[in-house]
């Protein structure tokens, strides 16, 4: 029988492996994306690096578990064979996978089987909701544009939100979900504010809207982070005759050197949403060295095309290479043991009996 020290040593050796791994690219519509899309590029670059890949369309995907062989497989709709997900497999999640609860439940299944993902379900749910992101970052004291929720289209609700931002125009109106600059409107008058809110709620009465302080700037910055490490940053210049600076809307991008304070704040934001591979967007302060930037949002599925052009290096290849180091693979913690109710000196109590029988890992106390 092996000693405890031998077991621990073996675990460390496994973690330090840097040979090719197995990769599942789980995306909303991988069949329809262009060849310049990040999902396609990940698959293409991974194969050149010797990484075995499986491109999985989340709509219709399902997981099977063979209890006898202890094998987990993920399947595209109509694919009976599927793809085996073992301890050497990681899942990269791309796109807006929050459209249906079943999509998120599939991610939870993957996590429960101990398969690591580039971002957790928790991270994705926070990042896909702009107000939830705002609240999470507010909890850790991040500098952000002042933001309020407009719960409905009543004049009172709109006025309250307007007053909370000191009645100063212009303001920015945003839907809680949406990316690439979609669902973001610059509001310059009170009349425009009420009409836009009414229009949005007429189209979808169950939507949620944010009103946000407008920060004057000619550009914003996208910083890409993998495992608490900044792998690239780009300056996105404001589009002509538009206040937005999204590269997907035509904004010109270029390399930018971040200050140490900006780096610290971006890393803090990524950690705040529990993100491992994320893009952090911010507007620099007037004094970039001494003043914290305004954090705008954190993107769990940041694109690769614009940032690769800005830093003149393929960021998908950089990310794939970083994950060769198994030490950065992060699995969601699993509860082990069972809760039991018992009586001590006439009083009923609930305690946790940790036998190790309800988990695939060993717990030591």
Where are these regions (language model features)?
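Short beta-strand micro-motifs enriched in acidic
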Residues: 224-226, 283-287, 354
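Aspartyl protease active-site motif detector
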Residues: 338-365
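C-terminal active-site "lid" helix and adjoining low-complexity regulatory extension at the edge
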Residues: 4, 10-13, 257, 271, ...
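ATP-binding N-terminal substructure of ATP-dependent carboxylate-amine bond-forming enzymes
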Residues: 2-118, 156
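Active-site nucleotide/adenylate-binding loops and adjacent lid/helix of ATP-dependent enzymes
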Residues: 20-32, 36-43, 73-75, 81-86, ...
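Protein kinase-like catalytic core scaffold
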Residues: 171, 232, 278, 294-297
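Phosphate-binding site of ATP-dependent enzymes
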Residues: 182-269
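A short glycine-rich, hydrophobically flanked beta-strand micro-motif that places a catalytic Asp/Glu
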Residues: 212-213, 275-287
């Amino acid at each position: 029988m092996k000693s405890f020290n031998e077991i621990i040593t073996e675990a460390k050796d496994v973690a330090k492996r840097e040979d090719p791994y197995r990769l599942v690219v789980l995306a909303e519509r991988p069949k329809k994306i262009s060849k310049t899309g990040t999902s396609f590029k990940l698959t293409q670059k991974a194969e050149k690096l010797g990484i075995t890949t499986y491109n999985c369309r989340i709509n219709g995907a399902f997981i099977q578990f063979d209890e006898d062989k202890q094998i987990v497989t993920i399947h595209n709709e109509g694919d009976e064979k599927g793809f085996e997900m073992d301890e050497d497999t990681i899942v990269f999640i791309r796109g807006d996978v929050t459209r249906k609860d079943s999509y998120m439940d599939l991610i939870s299944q993957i996590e429960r089987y101990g398969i690591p993902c580039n971002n957790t379900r928790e991270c994705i749910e926070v990042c896909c909701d702009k107000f939830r992101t705002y609240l999470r970052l507010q909890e850790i004291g991040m500098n952000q544009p002042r933001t309020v929720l407009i719960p409905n289209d009543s004049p009172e609700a709109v006025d309250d939100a307007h007053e909370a931002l000191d009645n100063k125009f212009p303001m920015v109106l945003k839907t809680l979900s949406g990316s690439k600059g979609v669902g973001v409107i610059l509001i310059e008058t009170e009349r425009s504010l009420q009409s836009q809110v009414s229009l949005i709620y007429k189209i979808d009465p169950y939507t949620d809207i944010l009103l946000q302080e407008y920060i004057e700037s000619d550009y914003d910055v996208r910083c890409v982070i993998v495992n608490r490490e900044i792998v690239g940053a780009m300056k996105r210049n404001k589009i002509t005759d538009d206040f937005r600076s999204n590269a997907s809307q035509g904004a010109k991008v270029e390399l930018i050197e971040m200050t140490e304070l900006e780096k610290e704040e971006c890393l803090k934001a990524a950690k705040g949403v529990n993100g491992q591979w994320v893009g952090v967007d911010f507007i620099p302060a007037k004094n970039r060295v001494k003043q914290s930037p305004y954090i705008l949002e954190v993107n769990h599925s940041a694109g690769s095309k614009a940032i690769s052009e800005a830093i003149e290096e393929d960021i998908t290849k950089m990310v794939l290479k970083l994950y060769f180091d198994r030490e950065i693979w992060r699995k969601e913690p699993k509860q082990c043991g069972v809760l039991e109710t018992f009586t001590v000196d006439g009083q009923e109590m609930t305690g946790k009996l940790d036998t190790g029988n309800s988990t695939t890992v060993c717990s030591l106390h």
